[in-house]
Structures are given as C-alpha cells and as structure tokens.
From Swiss-Prot:
Record field: compositional bias (Pro residues): 276-285
Sequence ranges assigned to domain SH3 in this UniProt record: 664-724
Compositional bias of kind Basic and acidic residues: 377-390
Compositionally biased residues, Polar residues: 42-75
Superkingdom, natural source: Eukaryota
Taxon lineage: Eukaryota, Metazoa, Chordata, Craniata, Vertebrata
Residue numbers of Phosphotyrosine PTMs: 491, 587
Known partners and oligomeric status: Interacts with SKAP1, LCK and FYN. The phosphorylated form interacts with LCP2.
Stated role: Adapter protein that plays a role in T-cell receptor (TCR)-mediated activation of signaling pathways. Required for T-cell activation and integrin-mediated T-cell adhesion in response to TCR stimulation.
Region Disordered, residue ranges: 17-76, 250-287, 367-390
Biological source species: Homo sapiens
GO BP term (any one): protein localization to plasma membrane
The protein's name: FYN-binding protein 2
Sequence motif: SH2-binding, positions: 521-524
C-alpha cells in the first residue's frame, strides 16, 4: 500500500513538472474506516470524478496520507468560503489496516504549486464562462471535444482503475461489507451531498490535463455545472486527492452559502401579459323544454314528399277537429289525426301530384292516456302552431321508439279523380284508411293494376290507402271539383271550437263533395256564434266603429247641451230655454261649418243681455264686456291688481296716521325737487312726479298720494300746484 502511494505521488509530481507526461493512471482509494480529517466519526468523504463531477460517499475511511505536523492555508480566488481555515491535522489513529503513514515533506510544496495552478485556471474559467454562457453552438462543440478526450484517456486509466478496485475490495472486506452495500450507500448519499460540494470543482480540474490544460479544465468544470450525474458507482470513478478531501471537509455549514453562484440559470415562466387573455368560455347550449312536444303531436316532414303522420286513438269528433288545427299552414305541413285502432295518412295537394312519396306513421299517444283532451282556446291553438313549426325541421329520434316509425313507399300515377263507394273495408293494416262500409270516398291516385291498394280520400278530406274489393266508380264533373277546392281554400282560416262542432254521421252517403263541403261549412258557421271570429269583409269592424263614434257623439252632445243651458240660465225669459235646448238637440246631427256655429253661439250668448233692464246693463256692462272679450283679459287682471294694491295702501295709511276721515282729493301738485325728509311718515318723491293732495296739517306739511297709491307727508316748498300755474 505504501509503495503504491509513493509511486502515484511521483507520477503526479512528474505530471505538473512536465505537461507532456502521460495522464494520471488513477487516484488512490482510501481504506475502509479512515476519515480524511482523522476522526473516527464517519463523516462523508467526497469523491471527485475524472471529469470534475463531485460524488459523496458514506464509507468511514481514513486516508493513509495525512500530514501530522504541517498545515498550509488554502485560499482559492473563486471559491467563497465563510471563513479561511488551515488544513486540519490528522492524528495517527489506528485503522482497520493497523498502521498509519506520514506524507513526505515534499507534499506541502506540491500542494502550494497545485493552488497556484488552480488560481490561474479558475480565472480563465470565469472569463470563458461569461463569453459562452448563452451560446448553444459553443456548448455543443465543447461536448464533442470532451467526449473525444475521454476516449483517449480511457486506455491510460484502465490500469489505475484496476488497482483501485483491488484496494477498495480489501477495505470492504475489512469492514465486513459486500460490494453491493457500499454502492447503494454511495447512490443514496451522492444525491444529498452533491449540490453542497460544487465549489470544490476548481481544485479538481488537474486530473485531465493534456496539451491545453486550461481549456480542458474549463470544459470539465462547465459540464459538471450543466449536467451533474445522479449517481455513480465507486468502482468506475477515481478517488479524490488528499488536499481536495481536506478542502471539502472544511466548514461544511458554510458551503450552501456559496453554491448558488454555480447553479445553472433556470428559465422563468412567461408572464400572463405576454400570453394574452385566456380563451373565452364556450357558450352554453340553449335551454330547451321538450314537454310541449311530448304532450302534443307534431308532424315532421322528412324530405320532399316524405311525411310522418302520427298514430293514436281518437273519437270521431276528435278526428274531425284535428283536420282544422292547422288551416293556414295546410300546404306546408300535414295535420295529424288519431282514430281508434287505425291511423290515417294525410297528404297535401302538392304531395299528391308527385309520382312517388313516402309516408311514415308515428305513434304519439302514450299507453295509459285514454282520457279525452280538454277544450283548447284560441291562445292554446296559437301556441300549438308555434311549437309545431320548429319541430317540423327536426327529425325525431327513431332509436327511442323503433316500433312507432315505419316508412313505406307508395307508387302513384296521375289520373282522373274517381269516387267509389266502399263495400268491404280492410282494417288489418295500420296504413289503411279508416271508414265504414257504404261510405263515399274519392279515389285520388291508384296503381295501374286494379287489385292493388288505392290512395283514397274520405268524405271529410282525409287521405290514405284503401284496399277495395268491390267498388262503384263515379267521375264527378271538373267544375264541381274546382268549386270544392275553392271552398276549401276560402275557409282555411276558420277556427273551430271542439265542443260546438257537430258529430258527423259517417254512414251517410252524400251526393257530391261540393255539397258536403258547403253544408259542412254552413254548420260550422252556425256553431260559431259564441266564438270570436275574424271578419274578412270588415263589416263587423265598421259596425263597432260606428257604435263607438255614436257613443262619443252622444256624450259630446250632452256636454254641449249642458254648457249652453248654463249660459241661457242668465236670461230672464225661462220659456226660451226649452226652445233653445230643443234647437240645439235638433241641429247637433247636422254638419255645420265652424263659422256658422260660432255666429249662432254669439247670438245666443248676447241675446239675453239685450233683454236685461237698463239699470243692470249700465252697472255690469263694462265688467261683462271685459270678462267676455279675450283681448281685455290682461287689462282687467292688471286693473284688479291695482285696485287691490290701492286698498291695501289705504288700510296701511289709516293705521299709521290714525286717519278716520273720508279720503278726498283736494288738489293736484307736481313735485319740484326731492324730499329732504326720509322718515317713516314722509312720502318719497322725485322731481316732475304728479301727486294728489289729500289733506293739510297745522305745519307746512301736506298729506299726498302718489301714482302707486302710497300716502305720506310732503313739504309745501317742494310742490308746485297746478291750479296756480294753469289759472287764467
């Protein structure tokens, strides 16, 4: 063991003295149980791989090369330690091999030489790291160069690795460990101590020095920073040198402070602003209520000429009413019917003209619903129509009710419509037309072969297939068929109440379809007396308008007579009032021009005034003329305001001056100058103002009144009397 250590140290010294020397065959493996610090505590010893990657080991090993008396401070420039400490001394403690060795004096000189080279190399590393930190191509090129150097070094390191394996196995046997146990311990401990020992990379770069040592060392350290190995077996990795173990063991609590400088930069997540707004939520599907479709049947056209007709049980009264549920939409859709035990295939005039068409039968009435339907109102029928129209465009799901939807083809050819009398009715099939024997049926279309089923129409207008065994043909006139179609078109918009429709006798045979239709619609019109209907001619609307205007006219007439009676009440002659009121009533119905009516009103208003006595006429003449003329309305209002103000001022004057005499104007005077007195009882005057003299006093004061009706004292000196100036 001692000879091998000396030999390896000599090779290490030769490598640093001469750079062209072959690479180091392999570092020394420590025996089991020997700690690099000299304590038998079993702290973790760090192993550095050949490419500069740290690996921790939990083996309690002691180094055979420890200096007991010499120590040297290690201060790398780029490794930031919390405190500068010297290499601790290793005590000569007994190990599993039973002896301890001391390093020679030349080891301290070589350690100082190693530190100088390390400092220079670390400076180069930092410069290169700044230059090529973000360059992807330089990193790729470095990867390729390192891999090529590893392949060259593999042959030289084979021998050294073999020797180190033998030493390591002997140490394991001394401790009683199998080769698998230390490997597992190394794997578990390596991942824990790996990040805290990244600052030891700088002293380790001297293992793989070749032609350009500074460049190769920088490549190894950069790779160790970028890709630290998750685990590595101790047999395939060289051991750490003595001085590196001592550095790694110094101040383990200070190492995590330094490691963040060597960690690779992580790419931050993009900001929310750069990503933009999130995509909007998808719109919710519309809420659809299908209860109306479940309760009420609907006809769904499949294609052009393809119709689904709903099947169920109906009374004969229901059968007739269902025909008129969609009168205004007769050409676009097919009304649905129910009959007891059979379903009826309906068709429109458009679909009859097509040579081929398909009819589907759909069962709508659920089992257990045998109760009669209530009488629908007009609003209810309007709702039905709105619900049926969107339903026609959506085909129903045939998977839920496969037994209720059957489609079959009917071949039809154009021909003259015929009329037959049913003798034997085939009721075994669902798609056959329901009817009684000896009922008149119109043959719309039939196949060329006479024994096939015929497309027939009942006397009520229902269409369907009919298998006729014996029939008597009758071809009606074209004019009759035209009138029947016209009559059907005329009464398309007629609405029916379910209770008032009379029951039809299906066994009665009719002479012609036109007569049947006419009688039918006449009966319907009779039963519709109590039901609100639409008058096509507008006569009903005109009648209502006339009644409305008549009522309004009567009201206006009553108001007019009342107002004129009130006006005529002022007159003295009472018998004339009756005549006037009768005249007004008589002539209200006559259309007169506005001028004539105004003239009559004026005459009637002024006539009683001429008949009044003269005394009343003289007193109230002026007031009445002013009140009745709109031009003098504002004048009278102004005069009334002035009168009220004069009365108020007079009342105030009597209270202040305690004046009980009658107010009489003695004289009038004109003010020559302003009044110098400004007391409460003095009247403010302005030069040129005309004043009325009411009374005199003992002093040289006069009680005067101005144009505003205010009273007060005025000095005689300021007045100029008119009678003096205007006297002859």
């Amino acid at each position: 063991m001692e000879g091998e250590g000396v030999r390896n140290f000599k090779e290490l010294r030769a490598k640093f003295q001469n750079l062209d020397a072959p690479p180091l065959p392999g570092p020394i493996k420590f025996p089991a149980g020997v700690s690099p610090k000299g304590d038998i505590g079993g702290t973790q010893s760090t192993q550095i791989l050949a490419n500069g990657k740290p690996l921790s080991s939990n083996h309690k090993q002691r180094t055979p090369y420890c200096s007991s008396s010499e120590s040297q401070p290690l201060q790398p420039q780029k490794i930031k330690l919390a405190q500068k400490s010297e290499i601790p001394k290793c005590s000569n403690s007994p190990g599993p091999l039973g002896k301890s060795t001391v390093c020679s004096a030349t080891s301290s000189q070589k350690a100082s030489l190693l530190l100088e080279v390390t400092q220079s190399n670390v400076e180069i590393i930092t410069k290169e790291k700044v230059m090529v930190a973000n360059s992807f191509r330089n990193k790729l090129w470095n990867w390729e160069k390192v891999s090529s150097q590893k392949s060259e070094m593999s042959s030289a390191l084979l021998l050294a690795n073999y020797g180190s394996k033998a030493i390591h196995l002997e140490g394991q046997k001394g401790m009683g460990l199998t080769p698998e146990e230390p490997r597992k311990k190394l794997e578990t401990k390596g991942a824990q101590t790996l990040p805290s020992q990244k600052h030891v990379v700088a002293p380790k770069i001297l293992h793989n020095v070749s032609e350009d040592p500074s460049f190769v060392i920088s490549q190894h350290i950069r790779k160790s920073w970028e890709n630290p190995p998750p685990e590595r077996s101790p047999a395939s990795s060289p051991c750490q040198p003595i001085y590196e173990c001592e550095l790694a063991s110094q101040a383990p609590e200070k190492q995590p402070d330094v490691r963040h400088h060597h960690l690779p930069k992580t790419k931050p997540l993009p900001s929310i602003d750069s990503l933009g707004p999130p995509p909007p939520k998808p719109s919710r599907p519309p809420i659809v209520n299908l209860q109306a479709f479940q309760r009420q049947p609907a006809a769904v056209p499949k294609t052009q000429g393809e119709v689904t007709v709903e099947e169920g049980s109906l009374s004969p009264e229901r059968l007739f009413n269902a025909e008129f549920e969609e009168p205004h939409n007769y050409e676009a859709t097919i009304s649905y019917l129910r009959h007891s035990g059979n379903s009826i295939n309906l068709c429109t005039a458009k679909e009859i003209a097509d040579p081929t068409y398909e009819v589907g039968i759909e069962e709508l009435q659920k089992p257990g619903k045998n109760f009669p339907y209530p009488e629908p109102s007009a609003k209810h029928e309007d709702k039905k129509m709105k619900e049926k129209q969107p339903c026609e465009l959506k085909p129903k799901n045939t998977e839920k009710e496969p037994y209720s939807n059957h489609v079959f083809k009917v071949d039809a050819c154009e021909g003259t419509p015929e009329k037959i009398q049913m003798t034997n009715v085939h009721t075994g099939r669902r798609n056959m037309l329901a009817g009684k024997q000896e009922a008149m049926i119109d043959i719309i279309q039939t196949n060329p072969c006479p024994e096939g089923p015929k497309l027939a129409r009942h006397s009520q207008g229902h269409c369907g297939h009919l298998e006729v065994l014996e029939s008597t043909k009758e071809t009606p006139d074209l004019g009759v068929s035209k009138t029947s179609s016209i009559s059907e078109e005329i009464y398309d918009d007629v609405e029916y109440s379910r209770k008032e429709v009379p029951k039809l006798n299906y066994s009665s045979s009719l002479a012609s379809s036109s007569e049947e239709n006419r009688e039918l619609y006449e009966d319907v019109y009779k039963t519709k007396n109590n039901y609100p209907k639409i008058d096509l001619d507008g006569k009903e609307a005109l009648k209502r308008l006339q009644q409305f205007f008549k009522k309004e006219k009567d009201r206006f007439k009553i108001k007019k007579t009342k107002s004129k009676e009130n006006l005529s009440a002022f007159s003295i002659l009472l018998p004339d009032l009756e005549l006037k009121s009768q005249e007004v009533i008589i002539y209200d119905d006559v259309d007169l021009s506005e001028k004539e009516s105004k003239d009559e009103d004026k005459l009637k208003m002024w006539k009683p005034k001429f008949l009044t006595p003269k005394e009343k006429k003289e007193k109230n003449g002026a007031e009445e003329s002013e009140s009745f003329s709109p031009r003098n309305f504002f004048k009278t209002k102004k005069q009334n305001l002035e009168k009220n103000r004069m009365k108020r001022e007079e009342k105030l004057f009597r209270e202040r001056f305690k004046y009980d005499k009658e107010i009489i104007v003695i004289n009038t005077a004109v003010a020559c100058s302003n009044n110098s007195r400004n007391g409460i009882f003095d009247l403010p005057i302005s030069p040129g103002e005309e004043l009325e003299v009411i009374d005199t006093t003992e002093q040289n004061l006069v009680i005067c009144r101005n144009s505003k009706g205010k009273y007060g004292y005025v000095l005689i000196e300021h007045l100029d009397f008119k009678h003096q100036s205007w006297s002859p």
